Amino acid sequence: MKIAVIGAMEEEVELLRASLNNAQRTTIAGSEYTTGTYEGKEVVLLKSGIGKVNAAMSTTILLHEFKPDVVINTGSAGGYDEALEVGAVVISDEVRHHDVDVTIFGYEIGQMAGMPAAYKSDERLMKVAEEAVKAVGEHQYGIGLICSGDAFMNDPERVEAVRHHFPQMKAVEMEAAAVAQVCYQFATPFVVIRALSDIAGKESNISFDEFLPVAAKHSTQVVLKAIASL
């Protein structure tokens, strides 16, 4: 099995890269792809760049050129579920865009024209991810909706506007829906495993800078456990 892991930033992929055996890097269209192995599994690690356009472009290249069997999107996220603290791990059961609105044409809020309203995570990958976070045994976790948009959610008014449309949302970030949409179009199973670096709207820019390394460490621990189980 070939497993693809996608993170947006260097801080989100550096521990994963360091864990790979026989790592070889290549750059395509400004995005970095590292191939290697972990626990005998073939891995392709993508540093996509920040935001949905970068994520969609680089994920398309990843799926077309490297042809992984499954995709794990990882890194940091902002918390929306008040029961989850900074450092908690969030596993997606579905992913949506929060900044798409073509409702005038009969679509749901967050639904892109011609696409499903939600991108469902693969059931097996969700189970593997949950078993992995339990095996690590150190982190609070939640499973649920993750939403994506091209905005850092530090404005309380924006945070509440998104919460109004997606009250069940666990976490927010800037790439997962783009990754999920491309996986949907390629019929490739995916799951999102992220850790909270901040709580959306609560001095989240300060918290993000401080706790990004913690979120990266926690998400990496769970992703590596998941890879070993696949």
From Swiss-Prot:
EC number of this enzyme: 3.2.2.9
Family of the protein in this entry: Belongs to the PNP/UDP phosphorylase family. MtnN subfamily.
Keyword Hydrolase applies: yes
Protein name: 5'-methylthioadenosine/S-adenosylhomocysteine nucleosidase
GO molecular function, one term: adenosylhomocysteine nucleosidase activity
Pfam families according to UniProt: PNP_UDP_1 (PF01048)
Native species: Lysinibacillus sphaericus (strain C3-41)
Major enzyme class: hydrolase
Active site: E12 (proton acceptor), D198 (proton donor)
Keywords recorded for this protein, A-Z: Amino-acid biosynthesis, Hydrolase, Methionine biosynthesis
A Gene Ontology BP annotation from the UniProt entry: nucleoside catabolic process
Annotated metabolic or biological route of this protein: Amino-acid biosynthesis; L-methionine biosynthesis via salvage pathway; S-methyl-5-thio-alpha-D-ribose 1-phosphate from S-methyl-5'-thioadenosine (hydrolase route): step 1/2
Task performed by this protein: Catalyzes the irreversible cleavage of the glycosidic bond in both 5'-methylthioadenosine (MTA) and S-adenosylhomocysteine (SAH/AdoHcy) to adenine and the corresponding thioribose, 5'-methylthioribose and S-ribosylhomocysteine, respectively. Also cleaves 5'-deoxyadenosine, a toxic by-product of radical S-adenosylmethionine (SAM) enzymes, into 5-deoxyribose and adenine.
S-S bridge residues: none
Catalyzed chemical reaction(s): S-adenosyl-L-homocysteine + H2O = S-(5-deoxy-D-ribos-5-yl)-L-homocysteine + adenine; S-methyl-5'-thioadenosine + H2O = 5-(methylsulfanyl)-D-ribose + adenine; 5'-deoxyadenosine + H2O = 5-deoxy-D-ribose + adenine
Superkingdom to which the source organism belongs: Bacteria
Residues where substrate binds: G78, M153, M174, E175
NCBIfam families found in the cross-reference section: MTA_SAH-Nsdase, PRK05584.1
Entry keyword Amino-acid biosynthesis: yes
InterPro entries per UniProt: MTA_SAH_Nsdase, Nucleoside_phosphorylase_d, Nucleoside_phosphorylase_sf
Gene Ontology CC entries for this record: cytosol
